[in-house]
Curated annotation (Swiss-Prot):
GO terms for biological process: isoleucine biosynthetic process; L-valine biosynthetic process. PROSITE patterns: ILVD_EDD_1, ILVD_EDD_2. It comes from the Bacteria. Mg(2+) binds at D81, D123, K124, E491. Its EC number is 4.2.1.9. [2Fe-2S] cluster binds at C122, C195. Functions in the biosynthesis of branched-chain amino acids. Catalyzes the dehydration of (2R,3R)-2,3-dihydroxy-3-methylpentanoate (2,3-dihydroxy-3-methylvalerate) into 2-oxo-3-methylpentanoate (2-oxo-3-methylvalerate) and of (2R)-2,3-dihydroxy-3-methylbutanoate (2,3-dihydroxyisovalerate) into 2-oxo-3-methylbutanoate (2-oxoisovalerate), the penultimate precursor to L-isoleucine and L-valine, respectively. This is Dihydroxy-acid dehydratase. Binds 1 [2Fe-2S] cluster per subunit. This cluster acts as a Lewis acid cofactor. The active site is at S517 (proton acceptor). GO terms for cellular component: cytosol. Pfam families: ILV_EDD_C, ILVD_EDD_N.
Length: 618
């Protein structure tokens, strides 16, 4: 039977000093035999998805104490990708994921915590904490701050549901008046919470449900709704139970690596494909799987993408459906239920709250459940009042959305498409693969071929789009923005949003070794691997070349002869130390970012650090 990790600091004569320090934090003699639970919070006033978390850590802590544990809270950093977008601040977003994972490891291992509750929400925070949970492999429960309510705006006498992306597109549209743009801006983000569509933050919080590490509703119940309080309360009780089961009952099934095993990662990716989640989730699932020492790869994602249908389209794939609508249709448990009925899930996987995923679906899938409390839970509605306060309203819809033929969530027989919402493409320009969010691609451009216009920074591409140098039929290539080449693998939300504002969202393609915001839609192909800075073929593309894209057949190719590419490769290598770097780009790269660039791997490997490779170890 494993001993509580915390005994290292709470037992024995030689730990008198450590116990003295624990006592100074408020612990008493009776506490030294209890599990010490880390409450990993991520409150910050910089991020709307985290601005309401300040008191929620202590809410969880009180419940842990009531259940017989000792709670100790600490905080991680949190970057707002939307505020960091469009300038060099975005270089720091993805690297912050590694810092978050490390900071959790440092605090938990330094103080020998026995288990943890991870209070996350936005883009890199949930993935960073997930990586830490898989790395540490101690009992863990995830609970997010929840999505914000969708904005509502009246334009020309008609009410529209809007979000951050709508405001960005409107601002770049010269046909929109300043007054209308300001109205959109003021309406786009009305409450606290993660941005209201199926962007990266909400995608990841939904995936923790499929992985079995969070409670039902974690990904969909609104930040402002009183029902979300129950998730925080239950997280406190649940983690103490899991800790006791492991340390006192010798039950290793409750550990993250045994819950989120290979089959659970397949379930999560299946959900991701079915709901058209953010392409960033591919990076994060690969990174978390690596921490869990699982051989889960792009090949597995490709395999799953060929058999999983698209069962839901949510903003940004469509403009009028947001997370509040997904919740009304039964949330993530409803999508998982439809996938199960289609034979696409392994429901034998365990969860932190149920013996198996199958048992969880029997209770929480609204097409199976007879529980009135479950149905009431999924009727939680937006309050429609601007608020930065958690649990500030308790409004409910009169009815659930149970329409599986034309509703927000479809069954497999009425899927939006037989192909899922994410796809992996391969070809000479992406030997290790690249990612496209097919749920956001118009059917008319699933196959596309056009002349290339090459840019070696996001800024140059944006300038070209806004000055009308990009025309219908063009393939925009932005390179040297990968994990190493950026460094930091910037999101390309501004270029894709500006293409929309110019009426080119269905007339152009954008290809990059960088990545895209969860708010991106259109023919946007990212994570091209190997990246230009690693000698990838994308580094040899020139203006006027043609690139052909065939999503149904999962191919992408640079239509240039092998002989010409060999010649270009020789010319590039002849640049010596400057080879495989941008020719004219001026960018200040800090020592912190240089360190990330030295250690990072390809997007095809999750853009994680590989210290062994750096120092020549096997």
């Amino acid at each position: 039977m494993p001993a509580y990790r915390s005994r290292t600091t709470t037992h024995g004569r030689n730990m008198a000093g450590a116990r003295g320090l624990w006592r100074a934090t408020g612990m008493k003699d009776s506490d030294f035999g209890k599990p010490i639970i880390a409450v990993v919070n991520s409150f910050t006033q910089f991020v709307p998805g985290h601005v309401h978390l300040k008191d929620l850590g202590q809410l969880v802590a009180r419940e842990i104490e009531a259940a017989g544990g000792v709670a100790k809270e600490f905080n991680t950093i949190a970057v707002d990708d939307g505020i960091a977008m469009g300038h060099d601040g975005m270089l720091y977003s993805l690297p912050s994921r590694e810092l978050i994972a490390d900071s959790v490891e440092y605090m938990v291992n330094a103080h020998c915590a026995d288990a943890m509750v991870c209070i996350s929400n936005c883009d890199k925070i949930t993935p960073g904490m997930l990586m830490a949970a898989m790395r540490l492999n101690i009992p863990a429960v995830f609970v997010s701050g929840g999505p914000m309510e969708a904005g509502k705006v009246v334009l020309k006498g008609k009410t529209h549901a809007v979000d951050l992306i709508d405001a960005m597109v409107a601002a770049a549209d010269s046909a929109m008046s300043d007054e209308d743009v300001q109205t959109m801006e003021r309406s786009a983000c009305p409450t606290c919470g993660s941005c209201s569509g199926m962007f990266t933050a909400n995608s990841m919080n939904c995936l923790t449900e499929a992985l079995g590490l969070s409670l039902p509703g974690n990904g969909s119940v609104l930040a402002t709704h009183s029902d979300r309080k129950r998730l925080f309360v239950e997280a406190g009780h649940t983690i103490v139970d899991l800790a006791r089961r492991y340390y006192e009952g010798d039950d290793a099934s409750v550990l993250p690596r045994n819950i989120a095993n290979f089959k659970a990662f397949e379930n999560a990716m299946t959900l991701d494909i079915a709901m058209g989640g953010s392409t960033n989730t591919v990076l994060h699932l690969l990174a978390a799987a690596r921490e869990a020492e699982l051989d889960f790869s792009m090949k597995d994602i490709d395999r799953l993408s060929r058999r999983v249908p698209c069962l839901s389209k949510i903003a940004p794939s469509v403009s009028d459906v947001h997370m509040e609508d997904v919740h009304r249709a039964g949330g993530i448990m409803a999508i998982l239920g439809e996938l199960d009925r289609a034979g696409l899930l392994d429901t034998s996987c365990t969860t932190v709250h149920s013996e198996t995923l199958g048992a969880a679906l029997a209770r929480w899938d609204i097409r199976q459940s007879n529980s009135e409390s479950v149905r009431t839970f999924f009727r939680a509605a937006p309050g429609g009042v601007p608020s930065q306060t958690a649990f500030s309203q308790d409004r409910r819809y009169d009815e659930l959305d149970l329409d599986r033929e034309k509703g927000v969530i479809r069954d497999a027989a009425h899927a939006f498409s037989k192909d899922g919402g994410l796809a992996v493409l391969y070809g000479n320009i992406a030997l290790d693969g690249c990612i496209v969010k097919t749920a956001g691609v118009d059917a008319s451009i699933l196959t596309f071929s056009g002349p290339v216009k090459v840019f070696e920074s996001q800024d140059d591409a944006v300038s070209a789009i806004l000055t009308n140098k990009i025309v219908a039929g063009d393939v925009v290539v932005i390179r040297y923005e990968g994990p190493r080449g950026g460094p930091g693998m910037q999101e390309m939300l501004y270029p894709t949003s500006y293409l929309k504002s110019k009426g080119l969202g269905k007339a152009c393609a954008l290809i990059t070794d960088g990545r895209f915001s969860g708010g991106t839609s259109g023919l946007s192909i990212g994570h091209v691997s190997p990246e230009a800075a690693e000698g990838g073929l994308i580094g040899l593309v020139r203006d006027g070349d043609r690139i052909s894209i065939d999503i149904p057949n999962r191919t992408i190719s640079l239509d240039v002869s092998e002989a010409e590419l060999a010649k270009r490769g020789e010319e590039e290598r002849a640049r010596g130390e400057a080879a495989w770097t941008p020719k004219d780009r001026k960018r200040n790269v800090s020592a912190a970012l240089q360190a990330y660039a030295m250690l990072t791997t390809s997007a095809a490997n999750g853009a994680v650090r590989d210290v062994k490779r750096r120092f020549g170890k096997n």
